[in-house]
Curated annotation (Swiss-Prot):
NCBIfam families: D_ala_D_alaTIGR, PRK01372.1. This is D-alanine--D-alanine ligase. Cell wall formation. It is found in: Cytoplasm. The gene is ddl. Keywords: ATP-binding, Cell shape, Cell wall biogenesis/degradation, Cytoplasm, Ligase, Magnesium, Manganese, Metal-binding, Nucleotide-binding, Peptidoglycan synthesis. Its main location: cytoplasm. The keyword Transcription regulation does not apply.
Amino acid sequence: MTTTYVKKFDGNTAALGRTLVLFGGTSSEREVSLRSGAAVLQALQAGGVDAHGLDVQADAIAKIEAFAPDRVFIALHGPGGEDGKMQAVLDWLAIPYTGSDHAASALAMDKLKTKQVWQSVGLVTPEYASLVENSDWQAVLDSLGGQGFVKPAHEGSSIGMSVVSTAQELKAAYEKAAHYDAKVLVERRIVGREFTVAVLNGVALPAIGLKTDHVFYDYDAKYVSNTTQYLCPCGLTQEKEAELQSIAQQAFAAVGCKGWGRVDFMQDEAGNFYLLEVNTVPGMTDHSLVPMAARQSGIEFNELVLEILAQTLV
């Protein structure tokens, strides 16, 4: 397992040519993406890259073709930008781009399919059930130990998520999640500590521990609250952090991801780790976790952005 990051970008910004940063879009994560894109664009321009931004709307493909960039930095979050669709368009246009390819992006965006892949290779993820309009709410909840997390299968940033402990709450949570996605799942609730591990160019960066006074690490805790605590160093022993980083790399590879991303975990009270999801285009805002982990590895934000973009030179 590799956990010591060696910078790969040689500083030759001329080799990057004209770069287009894609952000915004039309998903429920648009506001976060606008912030990520603005930060990335500013960092690239500060680093001497000929970088330009595009808020992705209905005419985005024509605008990308007209601009004819040498490479693209994808800072789109959620459906339409993180789910393989934009990646497939860029493949068709033969334009190099940051992050995972269209197949891995589509798989990682689907929490149900991702969990199935992880289970098939022996990686541990919380027990779960798919929900439909006429599910037996009590039976589902009983099968998961009486408490669950309800999630839209294709949303990020904890959008549409709920914690439930009664059949009535489960039904209401399903209806809330179904507003965002036709595919909804409920996971067994793991009580314990939450961690995340960023992966950059095959290297697992230092883990981050998350503490919030909310019921769970929801949208407000991620992007608005000033009371959320980010622990880096994460508070685990060296051995347990190494175990967590190893699982993150295995989970990342199992889905076929490459370049950069982030893997989220829960740790139960017995010390066992459970995989929650993988993010192929993590946030790059002032509250974001990948820049925090990179900083712990001696990589400042502007350097991190260049390291991610330099993946397109390979």
